[in-house]
């Protein structure tokens, strides 16, 4: 079933839900992910579009539809954040908007994809340049208005007209997590043991963006989908082990490489001794994505959608 969590009573071991009866638990997994912080810059809450949830994607899709159906010569888009989401989104939107698109990618640091392998970073820079995406590096967003964005570069303020601002920067934990009486770090993430259990609450497990986890070697676990996917396997095992009096396994993160989509028929990947970009990397990334689908039903639905989508797009033109 689906419901919104309003609170957790750890003493009575109850999960409180909005408009639903509360649920009791013997073991609890906290995997609420994170939220996009839009309160960092004046105007962002009102005028910037986050890009994290399915609801966010639908809102963005509707805004793009309106812009594409308008009489405007150009569609001006500013994407805040030169991380993975920002770069992939910039490439995809550049393909979608074509000659009408005027895209700029805004990054406060001196390079995009700061934690990415050099090969992937260079492939991304090449793709962005080929698609005409303007890079604003070492640039801070000062404020956002309905039709403009103010940027600071080397102490100089510049206001630029825009039709759409997309915010991909930062992560904050859900409000319900902050209300829990658990040990948390400065970002509000729940600190866990290497077995992914909440400190002083062995019946509760936490993983993903809301967890501050160190693995069996004491290394900080990155806040990536790849890490969360691996944590899920360990969590499932450890729940079973805790219920059957078997030893729990400390989490051991395995970095399997990195893949990024860079628009239509283009991607980059590194890992397991392989470095690949272009259409071959795009195909490899899609196959890996399909393989990672949780069930055969998901694989069939996604694969079928990939096959028929180009046909539908062609017929609708």
PLM features: what roles do these ranges have?
Residues 82, 108, 209, 264:
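Cofactor-binding loop segments of dinucleotide-utilizing enzymes, especially the Rossmann-like FAD-
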Residues 2, 68-73, 102, 245-253:
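A short alpha-helix-loop-beta-strand transition element characteristic
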Residues 60-107:
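Rossmann-like NAD(P)H-binding beta-loop-alpha module
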Residues 3-7, 95-194, 198-200, 248:
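A Rossmann-like FAD-binding core segment of flavoenzymes
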Residues 46-71, 159-230, 237:
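FAD-site-proximal beta/loop scaffold in flavoenzymes
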Residues 231, 236-317:
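C-terminal, flexible cofactor-proximal segment of oxidoreductases
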Residues 35, 85, 111:
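Conserved Rossmann-like nucleotide-cofactor binding loop
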Residues 1-78, 155, 166:
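FAD-binding core/adjacent interface of flavoenzyme oxidoreductases
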